Amino acid sequence: QFLGSMLMIYFSADFIVRYGKEIAISLGISKYIIGLTLIAFGTSFPEFVVSINASIMNEPSIVFGNVIGSNIANIALVLSACALITHINSDKVGKQDLIFFLLSSVVAFLVSMDGNISQLEGVILLSGFFFYCYRIKKNIIIEKNNIESVKEKRFDFYIIIIIVCSFFILVTGSNVFISSALSLAERFNVSSLVISTTMIAIGTSLPELATSLIAVINKEYELLTGNIIGSNIMNILMIMG
């Protein structure tokens, strides 16, 4: 069940990213913005669903561990694995996005120091996420204004159906994922926090890892850096909030 649910999460997220990218390209958005938004959201969706389900199951330690572990995995596992393959050109990285990520990490650390996140603190984190979305929207408008002509490309309706079905499979897979992870924790007498910061965090980071490796192989460094930065920001502000 554990392995099967991981495969469901991986392949469904892969479809979301693949076809989401095709839609975004047809709108004339840069690769970095694509990585920062659609691809980051698609690869962060497993963490989102896992954390929401963990909250419903009253397992806050899984939420904390999942967000922290996933962000560590994105940097220590995903980014380092890509760097081992080739030199990563980060010239296109938005410095403001990087600063925003660091600031959001500090805020998340401060609000979670007591081991709990209140509703007010959740509102603060979500407010930061909405401000982040507003900034991205402004950047998209600026980019489109700077492009003299954008060739419009129609995308078929079946792509929307594939994405919706992929989201459904993702939700189902994450449900099985949490249940099997908790069963493993009970069987080996391991705390749910340890399980969430290791197996669940790495498992939900598989879409980021796969997408980033493919981006590096194709020398799409903007997609790689945008994906990692955007995914980490969403993990902190959207998922934890």
Label the model's feature ranges.
Residues Q1-G241:
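Hydrophobic alpha-helical segments, chiefly the membrane-spanning helices
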